Amino acid sequence: MLKAVVDGGTAGRLRHKYNMKGELAGKTGTTNNNSDAWFMGITPTLVNACWVGGDDRDIHFDSMSMGQGATMALPIFALYMQNVYKDSQLGYNENAIFDLPADYDPCSFVEEALEANDIEEIFE
């Protein structure tokens, strides 16, 4: 789900503007009154949180376009990760892939709930 944010959603500029390759996931965020801009960047081997804002709640960005996580916080993640990947001593690989356990079935709980005919169990 969070990979789609990068591949075709609000964090798409990681691919297009910053030319980032490999598997990435992320979540952009903006708080009320454009006070804070967030970006959570996830790679197979590293998780990053970027926040741009002020401790004083009276401080805020002038507009929604400037206060969005994709506008203010995402570029910090992109530039940081470009430098991480350039530094071979750190050992991070831009071509790493997300690893799932062999027996992982994201729909198993749905099938069990439907078999029990208890739709409420799905939403607990």
Regions from the language model: what does each represent?
Residues 1-123:
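A penicillin-recognizing enzyme superfamily signal
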